[in-house]
From Swiss-Prot:
Tissue: Highly expressed in brain, in regions such as the hippocampus, the habenular, thalamic nuclei and hypophysial pars tuberalis. Expression levels in the hypophysial pars tuberalis vary between day and night: they are low at mid-day and high at mid-night. The expression in the other regions do not display a day/night difference.
Induction: By ischemia. Up-regulated in the microglia in the middle cerebral artery occlusion (MCAO), expression reduced back to control level at 14 days after MCAO.
Function comment: Plays a role in the regulation of microglia polarization.
Main location group: secreted
Protein's UniProt name: Chemokine-like protein TAFA-3
Gene from which the chain derives: Tafa3
Lineage: Eukaryota, Metazoa, Chordata, Craniata, Vertebrata
Amino acid sequence: MERPTSNWSAGSWVLALCLAWLWTCPASASLQPPTSAVLVKQGTCEVIAAHRCCNRNRIEERSQTVKCSCLSGQVAGTTRAKPSCVDASIVLQKWWCQMEPCLLGEECKVLPDLSGWSCSSGHKVKTTKVTR
């Protein structure tokens, strides 16, 4: 059962999008020339587009398109609600909270099915689900 979410942090959506991109791209993609005019400094990520939508249940959904250039052994992730490069083992083993995806003062909990994490502070809960 999915929890209602509100005020999703931009970084939470970034991770989901980056991971979906990472898992669907061929391993040789890093050897191909860049197809976009956006150049990103190695070891960093940059937001190149942002989207926001609300549905009938007053749940705000946010997503971002991010371009990352991670170092060897790193993949796109989220740190302090912002896109970042994180150790690949965190993502492979689904230890989401080890990349510190929540803002300071928020509590991170891995979802029971390991499909993502939630960040909570008071009565506010932001849930991020990673999809392939």
